[in-house]
Amino acid sequence: IIFSMWLLFSFSESTEYIAGDSESSWKVNFPSREALIDWATRHQFTYSDTVVNEDEDHDCNTKIHSKLGDMVVTKRPLVLPPLITLPLSPSPAPAPNTSGAAAGCGFMAFLEVSVAMLMFLIWL
């Protein structure tokens, strides 16, 4: 099931693209991704007759259109901070066996967990 879902998502592609907002939207049909790239390079999007590239977008204030109106973004963080920081917990894996006794216990635990997970996936 997981493989078939991956296969479906990896080979699915949209061939209709909607451009514009809800009032003045229009559909563009493209037979392939290369046609979309060619169209985008011929039709550069502008704001107030000024082309805004990626460097200018990160370096200066940029107006972004939203449904509530124009929103001014002053500076975007390069990396978003995590929403939740979890404390470090001890590893659930057993400590390495240095005494020499019962040398295969770690592998047996791994095998039991693997078989249990496989049975759970088959049950789904």
Swiss-Prot record:
Transmembrane segments annotated in the record for this chain: none
Any one GO BP annotation for this protein: nodulation
Key words, A-Z: Nodulation, Signal
Keyword check for Signal: yes
Top-level taxon: Eukaryota
Segment forming the signal sequence: 1-12
Entry function: Involved in the infection process during the plant-rhizobium interaction.
Name assigned to this protein: Early nodulin-5
Species the sequence originates in: Vicia sativa (Spring vetch)
